Swiss-Prot record:
Protein name: Sodium/hydrogen exchanger 5
Basic residues bias locations: 660-672
Gene3D superfamilies in the record: 6.10.140.1330
Encoding gene, per UniProt annotation: SLC9A5
Regulation: ATP-depletion almost completely abolishes SLC9A5 activity. Inhibited by amiloride compounds.
Cellular compartments annotated: Cell membrane; Recycling endosome membrane; Cell projection, Dendritic spine membrane; Synaptic cell membrane
Organism: Homo sapiens (Human)
Purpose: Plasma membrane Na(+)/H(+) antiporter. Mediates the electroneutral exchange of intracellular H(+) ions for extracellular Na(+) in 1:1 stoichiometry, thus regulating intracellular pH homeostasis, in particular in neural tissues. Acts as a negative regulator of dendritic spine growth. Plays a role in postsynaptic remodeling and signaling. Can also contribute to organellar pH regulation, with consequences for receptor tyrosine kinase trafficking.
Bias-annotated ranges (Polar residues): 854-864
UniProt entry keywords in alphabetical sequence: Antiport, Cell junction, Cell membrane, Cell projection, Endosome, Glycoprotein, Ion transport, Membrane, Phosphoprotein, Postsynaptic cell membrane, Sodium, Sodium transport, Synapse, Transmembrane, Transmembrane helix, Transport
Organs and tissues of expression: Mainly expressed in brain. Expressed in neurons of the central and peripheral nervous system. Expressed also in testis, spleen, and skeletal muscle.
């Protein structure tokens, strides 16, 4: 229609353009001048019509889906066939002849490969191999049964005189027609069953049968066609043996071609790390090459491209990038959808041309009855045999759906068009019968299969992603069943699947996957990775900011009690005691506004950032540039990681420079006492916490190697990141890779977000006023064993403070710091006359508190002080602490 319409529109323009050239030119006249406009339709006719057909098909799908009620009742394939009939009628009325037909060459070489590749590539491999025995039974035995029974029944119908005498066909002709009309079409099955949404087992059995019966269909068609051309009198016994052997050659040869190209495709994508942009192209080219190679060798092309897609997906998906996977998915789906739409439209258009078919009612009705009857009978017989060996048998409802789902489509129409009229005189009758069968199965059965499924209450497919718990249990049961088969000595399906997985893990995966992809294919790490993703999503939903260690509560993390929760003061508070061992000097009660401001401050500091550059002036032919969202996410991640890794850079904590020279450790903070200097000089570290039990070794690349790396690579591997290699300290020292000057220092903390002004204010300067000291008489409280010593010392200290001399109120002056390198002298306490009493922490506690305040001044919240220690620990000094005293003044209350 489009060609005729454009031709009609082109007539006046072409005539106007050709009018000057139609005049005879005299020898003396000059040549015509420059033409402003010329109509060149014939030069762009073929690609223009292809583009228009695809555009019309796409617009038709859009129009169909505008009405949800129509698409819910009528399958899309039926609507496309009806649209093709309408367009074919319009073209026939305008041009007086059928301009467009579904040519077999166009169908087999250009329209069918995308559909089969999409089906094989995205086929659920586990479900396919679980039901492989049933699929092969229905595909091979069922197709042979349908072909021979249908052909023999039609021949018997002709011998009975129910077929018109003008249908000149013998037994071989009817067997040839039965071989092409008995095969279930994958295009029709896929178009109808995807809209019905039957359960996965039914779908994979019917669809797998439609894919794998291609080998049987091709062999039967070629063998019967050869016998027809040879003549029944010239067929020898060896020809029958060759026909049986060709069944194995065509099927196994097609599968072998597909597996070879799948191996090449997986191996090629292993080396495309630096040229990501061509990964989708390689997938389509090598898959199409497998189809053409099998077609060239007269093998099963459908089986070849199916095995190619099924065999390469695991390795290709692991090698290519995420963007390439998305491109392959949507491009493959788009090509398959367009090809399927064009096929059904051309089927409708081809049916309009009455010059290529002849009608015979007996043949048409007999064919419809026989294909339905023998299909149902074959399914029942084969299912009865299969149920003897299946753990989950197929019930009668499943058998009804399988019998009713044997749809015929464009494959049968293309094969009947390829028949030679000189060799098969009844070709026109076979064409008409094939068109009726295709229309009946696609339209009538397609319209009624959904109500039939609802009426029979067939189990539908459940579109939900399995949980991690379900996947773990499935793997567990697989290993248990394989172990049971191994114990009883029965090598069944689970045993061979386990052997194949071991072979794949040991050889194929290491050969066809790059190392980074092979590492992340481990199932345990995969589950652990998804657990981390789930925890991260849960953390973000709770309002946390990126990579913050404060307020982090994840579902998969065990609860940890903080230091404040295990202190003696909190135990007293929970038990209702009136004693306050820390003298209430660090109890800071902030207002709700201050707490809200602090939370908002940390949230904004973690979530907001200043972009480094607004525009990124880079272009590469090998990678796809990042969009704004991806670039923003990367900058946020890099900014947070840089801020948190500054502690490693400053302290050089256990850094093993494996590729560069070890750098000497810089001297830390100046020590203010001689003991600290002496301990630092001797390299002795005392009082290290639990963080120092296992050191973390960072593998850092040198700056020279970073400069020598390829600067043109603008997109890194999706699964690459910062790699932390954790080793024991003893292992690193034994290897001898760390210089002696590179000391091992305590593990740095993760830098928390910057504190607010309210959090920087010291607790005892929060304006709470003078607080009275309360001493509880209940000194026999139940205290944990590890806190008994601190409890006794604290109670004794408070009792001594609660009973000073009555005529004096001692005051303690701040002691000046001692010079470095000298011993700490015993300084007597001066007791001036002052109504207020004062108290000094012991030197060890004062130095520890001073050290902690200096090293962690940026902490948003101060931990509660530990219980007061006795004077007997004055000589104990922690490394790196000062000798200055920390003075705390308080008023004695009248309620002592």
């Amino acid at each position: 229609m489009l060609r005729a319409a454009l031709s009609l529109l082109a007539l006046p323009l072409a005539g106007a353009a050709e009018e000057p050239t139609q005049k005879p030119e005299s020898p003396g006249e000059p040549p015509p001048g420059l033409e402003l406009f010329r109509w060149q339709w014939h030069e762009v006719e073929a690609p223009y019509l292809v583009a228009l057909w695809i555009l019309v098909a796409s617009l038709a799908k859009i129009v169909f889906h505008l009405s949800r009620k129509v698409t819910s009742l009528v399958p899309e394939s039926c609507l496309l066939i009806l649209l093709g009939l309408v367009l074919g009628g319009i073209v026939l009325a305008v041009a007086k002849k059928a301009e467009y037909q579904l040519e077999p060459g166009t169908f087999f070489l250009f329209l069918l490969p995308p559909i089969v590749l999409d089906s094989g590539y995205f086929m659920p491999s586990r479900l396919f191999f679980d039901n492989l025995g049933a699929i092969l039974t229905y595909a091979v035995v069922g197709t042979l049964w349908n072909a021979f029974t249908t052909g023999a029944a039609l021949w018997g119908l002709q011998q009975a005189g129910l077929v018109a005498p003008r249908v000149q066909a013998g037994l071989l002709d009817f067997l040839l027609f039965g071989s092409l009309i008995s095969a279930v079409d994958p295009v029709a099955v896929l178009a109808v069953f995807e809209e019905v949404h039957v359960n996965e087992t039914l779908f994979i059995i019917v669809f797998g049968e439609s894919l794998l019966n291609d080998a049987v269909t091709v062999v039967l068609y070629k063998v019967c066609n050869s016998f027809v051309e040879m003549g029944s009198a010239n067929v020898q016994a060896t020809d029958y043996l060759k026909g049986v052997a060709s069944l194995f050659v065509v099927s196994l040869g097609g599968a072998a071609v597909g597996l070879v190209f799948a191996f090449l495709l997986a191996l090629t994508t292993r080396f495309t790390k630096r040229v990501r942009i061509i990964e989708p192209l390689l997938v389509f080219l090598l898959a199409y090459a497998a189809y053409l190679t099998a077609e060239m060798a007269s093998l099963s092309a459908i089986l070849a491209v199916t095995m190619c897609g099924l065999g390469c997906k695991k390795y290709v998906e692991a090698n290519i990038s995420h963007k390439s996977r998305t491109t392959v998915k949507y491009t493959m789906k788009t090509l398959a959808s367009c090809a399927e739409t064009v096929i059904f439209m051309l089927l409708g258009i081809s049916a309009v041309d009455s010059s290529k078919w002849a009608w015979d009612s007996g043949l048409v009705l007999g064919t419809l009855i026989f294909i339905l009857f023998f299909r149902a009978l074959g399914v029942v017989l084969q299912t009865w045999v299969l149920n003897q060996f299946r753990l989950v048998p197929l019930d009668k409802i499943d058998q009804v759906v399988m019998s009713y789902g044997g749809l015929r489509g464009a494959v049968a129409f293309a094969l009947v068009i390829l028949l030679d009229r000189t060799k098969v005189p009844a070709k026109d009758y076979f064409v008409a019968t094939t068109i009726v069968v295709v229309f009946f199965t696609v339209i009538v059965q397609g319209l009624t299969i959904k109500p039939l499924v609802k009426w029979l209450k067939v189990k539908r497919s459940e579109h939900h992603k399995p949980t991690l718990n379900q996947e773990l249990h499935e793997h567990t049961f697989d290993h248990i069943l394989a172990a049971v088969e191994d114990v009883v000595g029965h090598h069944g399906y689970h045993y061979w699947r386990d052997r194949w997985e071991q072979f794949d893990k040991k050889y194929l995966s290491q050969l066809l996957m790059r190392r980074s992809a092979y590492r992340i294919r481990d199932q345990i790490w995969d589950v652990y990775y998804r657990l981390n993703i789930r925890d991260a999503i849960s953390f973000v939903d709770q309002g946390g900011h990126v990579l913050s260690s404060t307020g982090l509560t994840l579902p998969s993390m065990p609860s940890r009690n903080s230091v404040a929760e295990t202190s003696v003061t909190n135990l007293l508070r929970e038990s209702g005691s009136g004693a306050c061992l820390d003298l209430q000097v660090i109890d800071t009660v902030r207002s709700g506004r201050d707490r809200e401001d602090a939370v908002m401050h940390h949230l904004l500091c973690g979530g907001l950032y200043k972009p480094r550059r607004r525009y990124k002036a880079s272009c590469s032919r090998h990678f796809i540039s990042e969009d704004a969202q991806e670039r923003q996410d990367k900058e946020v991640f890099q900014q947070n990681m840089k801020r948190r890794l500054e502690s490693f850079k400053s302290t050089k904590h256990n850094i093993c420079f494996t590729k560069s020279k070890p750098r000497p450790r810089k001297t830390g903070r100046r020590k203010k006492d001689g003991v600290a200097n002496a301990e630092a000089t001797n390299g002795k570290h005392r009082g290290l916490g639990f963080q120092d039990t296992a050191a973390v070794i960072l593998t850092v690349e040198s700056e020279e190697e970073e400069e020598e790396s390829d600067s043109s690579e603008t997109e890194k591997e999706d699964d690459e990141g910062i790699i932390f290699v954790a080793r024991a300290t003893s292992e690193v020292l034994q290897e001898g890779k760390v210089s002696g000057s590179l000391e091992v220092c305590p593990s740095p903390r993760i830098i928390p977000p910057s504190p607010t002004c309210a959090e920087k204010e010291l607790p005892w300067k929060s304006g709470q006023g003078d607080l009275a000291v309360y001493v509880s008489s209940e000194t026999t409280k139940i205290v944990p064993v590890d806190m008994q010593t601190g409890w006794n010392q604290s109670i004794s200290s408070l009792e001594s403070l609660a009973s000073p001399p009555c005529n004096q109120a001692p005051i303690l002056t701040c002691l000046p710091p001692h010079p470095r390198g000298t011993e700490e002298p015993q300084v007597p306490l001066h007791l001036p006359s002052d109504p207020r009493s004062s108290f000094a922490f012991p030197p060890s506690l004062a130095k520890a508190g001073r050290s902690r305040s200096e090293s962690s001044a940026d902490l948003p919240q101060q931990q509660e002080l530990q219980p007061l220690m006795g004077h007997k620990d004055h000589t104990h000094l922690s490394p790196g602490t000062a000798t200055s005293h920390w003075c705390i003044q308080f008023n004695r209350g009248s309620r002592l």
